[in-house]
Amino acid sequence: MSELLSVALFLASVLIYAWKAGRNTWWFAATLTVLGLFVILNITLYASDYFTGDGINDAVLYTLTNSLTGAGVGKYILPGIGIALALVAVFGALGWILRRRRHHPHHVGYSLLALLLALGSVDASPAFRQITELVKSQMRDGDPDFAVYYKEPAKTIPNPKLNLVYIYGESLERTYFDNDAFPNLTPELGALKNEGLDFSHTMQLPGTDYTIAGMVASQCGIPLFAPFEGNASASVSSFFPQNICLGDILKNSGYQNYFVQGANLRFAGKDVFLKSHGFDHLYGAEELKTVVADPSYRNDWGFYDDTVLDEAWKKFEALSRSGQRFSLFTLTVDTHHPDGFISRTCNRKRYDYDGKPNQSFSAVSCSQENIAEFINKIKASPWFKDTVIVVSSDHLAMNNTAWKYLNKQDRNNLFFILRGDKPQQETLAVKRNTMDNGATVLDILGGDNFIGLGRSSLSGQSLSEVFLNVKEKVLAMKPDIIRLWNFPKEIKDFTVDRDKNMIAFSGSHFRLPLLLRVSDKRVEPLPESEYSAPLRFQLADFAPRDNFVWIDRCYKMAQLWAPALALSTDWCVSQGQLGGQQTVQHVDKAQWKGKTAFKETVIDVTRYQGNVDTLKIVDNDIRYKADSFIFNVAGAPEEVKQFSGISRPESWGRWSNAQLGDEVKIEYKAPLPKKFDLVITAKAFGDNANRPIPVRVGNEEQTLVLGHDVSTITLHFNNPTDANTLVIAPPAPVSTNEGNILGHSPRKLGIGMVEIKVVNVES
């Protein structure tokens, strides 16, 4: 209703100003500004829904104000360009319409009415309401009801008798199981759901709407609100250290806790969270690659669900035979947005909707088949009678190719339980949320019926029942939940551990690199994650007087304040203000101790803008002084004009990447010498090893042969045509996720370059 009202007010404002207000520059500018704000707010809301399917929330605000790196980002480029073009077109059209009668006399009354209607349209828009609520949640000091409803459970289960298998289905919400809406989409897992305790109204709350957040909510009974963006949790050394979560209780009760997934455990700090709360046995992409049958059978995120669930079954079987009390948690990935992935062992690899194949539905149909097969193995085993199986979605599906169809339904998370000791078949329509999952499981296992803000749906009352406005209530509790991190409010002394890549201050530890914004009684950590912008881009958003401490590789800050360290990959510490003075210190000891030293200084606006502009230079445009191309730092030597076909810097160098260009091309500003030696330190990937690799300068071509290990080879070139471009053409680029950023599309690797040097041998 508010959406229709806001649109009506917007149109009324446009029409009244265009046809009645007449000419006046000030009123025109004011009205256009407010109407433009309405347009921006609604386009932001549309973009937010496109990226995550959940309006403007904490995760969206972070994602839209930082780089959109991560899973499937290429799928969002065209929509992003379309939104930008639409914004320009709408502003142009709006300005033209408002000035239609600019030659008519000005009328103050109609101008005022048009402006008031424009302000009303902004106030009535859902986008403005969502942003206002988020801002309020940041400014509140907490909610008095938090202390009333937050409860710590007992640390042990008296006389535990049941083992636990807990399956997180990536984005596998209950909506997919509506057979009327999506016929025969989930026949196998749907049948199992109907055999157990099926909780049909599990809503999604703020701070529970992405994987690590859903895991925290389901095990600790609290949303993932933190003094930093949630997916950057990989940088912390402990996770809600004061909380008692399900894993802690299980461990204290004699359980061995296992977690198995196909993706890298470090992503979003799942390893830190699990290790902080009772899990001693973790298996992710790195741990599984030495034990799975086919290490090359992977998708963009890691191993396919059939592989992961096969390994989970092996763990279940071995642990059950041992007689040891255990919990086994596993997380699937094949249903990850935007399209999902199809395991090769599925019987159904295609699901049609609206008369055409739909990749996301196909992935769901396949993944649920794999999950059902895993569960049926457990049910058929002699150990099922001592086992509780839990199946839940980690969160609602984000924007995938099925999302517009999901949104036509009443959406809820999946949560059902199969008890081997006491089979129960019932659909429970009680209102609940993800925070209630852990408490419900704990209740079944014989423990308390509460964890944090979560309550057992079998014997307690969920916050979703207590509060009609439970989403707003949870947001009001955000400051209380952030305080549970016990995060320091100041930094004076700190220690950088060079070998462990950690920084410690005021009792907290963070992985490097790290950026800190320091103010009175607040230290805001800005870690670098797969979904965040590089730290230098984040620093560029600081105000001129913001105090910062930046710990990163020296070369990343050297171009600004320490040119002598431009090629150093060691750790450096910079601190100061962008508009004032900055220092850079080289970390030259294994345990390097530092102190913060922020000086009051006159702000230099010109210096500030210069620093910001330099920080925002993209990697490939950075230039440094050197007599060779060093590939493990960003940028290129000053002599290089541009280059292509080369991937991002890694600790050892860079790969060629045929996804970015069929050949490696390095174009120099000036012609290369008439005679020169080309000294190449490199290695080959896959089938490119021990094969001739063409290297061209102008009309002359040499061949390079590399092995899998790094070697240095010198090629002799004549350059009579004064060519200025070096071309290297790997013969057999290999599509692989080797060394790739989690969630990115595979790269096509050819050769790995460490250094290229041009040596003039003209007499």
From Swiss-Prot:
Entry's family note: Belongs to the OpgB family.
Family annotation (Gene3D superfamilies): Alkaline Phosphatase, subunit A (3.40.720.10)
Reaction(s) catalysed (UniProt annotation): a phosphatidylglycerol + a membrane-derived-oligosaccharide D-glucose = a 1,2-diacyl-sn-glycerol + a membrane-derived-oligosaccharide 6-(glycerophospho)-D-glucose
CDD domains documented for this protein: LTA_synthase
Subcellular location: Cell inner membrane
EC number, UniProt record: 2.7.8.20
Pathway: Glycan metabolism; osmoregulated periplasmic glucan (OPG) biosynthesis
InterPro entries: Alkaline_phosphatase_core_sf, DUF7024, OpgB, OpgB/LTA_synthase_biosynth, Sulfatase_N
Organism listed in the record: Salmonella paratyphi B (strain ATCC BAA-1250 / SPB7)
Encoding gene (name): mdoB
Keywords: Cell inner membrane, Cell membrane, Membrane, Transferase, Transmembrane, Transmembrane helix
Keyword Transmembrane helix carried by entry: yes
A single GO molecular function term of this UniProt record: phosphatidylglycerol-membrane-oligosaccharide glycerophosphotransferase activity
Top EC class for this record: transferase
GO biological process terms, semicolon-separated: glucan biosynthetic process
Membrane protein topology class: Multi-pass membrane protein
Record function comment: Transfers a phosphoglycerol residue from phosphatidylglycerol to the membrane-bound nascent glucan backbones.
Name of the protein described by the UniProt record: Phosphoglycerol transferase I
GO cellular component, one term: plasma membrane
Residue ranges crossing the lipid bilayer per the database entry: 1-21, 26-46, 77-97, 108-128
